[in-house]
Amino acid sequence: MDPFIEPGALVRHPDREDWGLGQVQSVVGSRVTVDFEHAGKQALDSKVVRLIFVGDED
């Protein structure tokens, strides 16, 4: 998993551009919960989906 993928990080889904920008809510093992602008909260498996890191919340 990308070391930048941690709570508060801003990400995009590589195959779902329509979901918009997402903010990582939690990371537990390979499970990442992200709150996307247009898709709401989604639980993703980082072994299956490699999220694109956009930046930090700060």
Model regions and ranges:
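Basic/aromatic-rich interaction segments and small domains that mediate binding to polyanionic partners
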Residues: 2-58
